[in-house]
């Protein structure tokens, strides 16, 4: 049907006859000549229709953008090159044309980003954009690289079930009713976590899978209800071994896809990350760090001014921003209101005009409560310079960390004082085993199958809130790319963890009985990780929305506008499944 792809024709093909298939991208009618940019998935080539060839010229006149055609023609040299096209040195003089289908008038405009809902409804048209097509090609390249890498490391690609048991894993499950067992439901997996652990118990030494996962949760620009995970698990390995494997894989992907050499990934503990960056997902391109000055500004002396409750675990800390000369009082007020969203009472500042003059040339909302010695110590600890501004908070530790962490991100976005096209991966390790809710109850920080860090066994018994897990997240430029851990491989410890997070024994048997039973038959030590493929592709294609790297994504309300799903079912089908819909 064709002898060449549109984007592959070059000057070396001059005077050759070619057969091309594709879509009408753009039409320009000059009375005696019609020029058409023809497109397929490799690129664009210019077609020329001469009026003296009346048969093909007449057909060309009636064409519309996005009509699907086949042409036969001779490769000619252009009078003037088009340097914007790979095929810009040549054009095709058409002598035959076959019209497969004329397109309707388009509901979207390719020249600009049309309404998102329109783009998703007509996704088959949206996917004809070169940008989206290129994203899917890059996605394909990444998955190909992953498979080759994992095969070379002797990992087995093993599929795990999509119809499985509903287990509490944090988010809500998507449920599938069983026709054969009325009133019973399968769940679509949020991850293959339990199955991959069972595979390790089964003696499968190394497993991986590029797999769809499902979570019925509120969406945002980097989340979808169905997403793709690079799932990895191995027996008789440490957390270091898994991190080294993944680091090698990520470095290979970045090198092969965008020709970028990543440096060795630093490792930061969860507690250090929260203290230094106010986040467990720090963007290390931003050089600012939170500086603790609790040792300089005595809490008891300033408690009244800062409205600190001395009975709580407090922190006094600040950010040193280098472009203070760009920060107006209006901007300071804006940032003060911004941090209130995260529980902060008031944002204080110290603006340094001439550091040589110390106290005289400093503007500050707390100048009256700082003596010269305290101020000197603050300037010394922050290494502040002329033109810097210090943003200071004093409050509960969690509030200070969160508020200054978010302010750090906002300052980075507002002033972009770091290189955008650089990459800063980091491992965040040693997360707390549990989170304690406001009612005092515990929940798992990662998931309840995460193993304790060495020498934390006693804490599990006596102080669960102090227990540290052998866990790790990979963060790149502020995005969490993946998370993993060493797994519990002792049935007794697994039961203890379930007890701590409030899963009753009966519920343990119902939901996790198969795992606990399997853990009684000589399970090996094992560890693993899950990486978000969609987020990796999103980063490498420099897109802001995960929808742009998925062929058929959902909206932020989990709708597919193209197929109009989810949709209602006939009463007869619901009756067969034993389902009665209650009206809200």
Curated annotation (Swiss-Prot):
Per its record, the protein catalyses: tRNA(Asp) + L-aspartate + ATP = L-aspartyl-tRNA(Asp) + AMP + diphosphate
Q: Which Gene3D superfamilies does the entry mention?
A: Bira Bifunctional Protein, Domain 2, GAD-like domain, Nucleic acid-binding proteins
Q: Report the protein's function.
A: Catalyzes the attachment of L-aspartate to tRNA(Asp) in a two-step reaction: L-aspartate is first activated by ATP to form Asp-AMP and then transferred to the acceptor end of tRNA(Asp).
State where ATP binds: 215-217, 224, 480, 532-535
- What name has this protein been given in UniProt? Aspartate--tRNA ligase
Organismal lineage: Bacteria, Pseudomonadati, Pseudomonadota, Gammaproteobacteria, Enterobacterales
> What is the primary gene name for this protein?
aspS
Instruction: Return the PROSITE patterns for the record.
Output: AA_TRNA_LIGASE_II (PS50862)
A GO biological process of this protein is: aspartyl-tRNA aminoacylation
Major localization class: cytoplasm
**Region of interest: Aspartate:** 193-196
Q: Where in the cell is it found?
A: Cytoplasm
Residue sites binding L-aspartate per the record: 169, 215, 446, 487
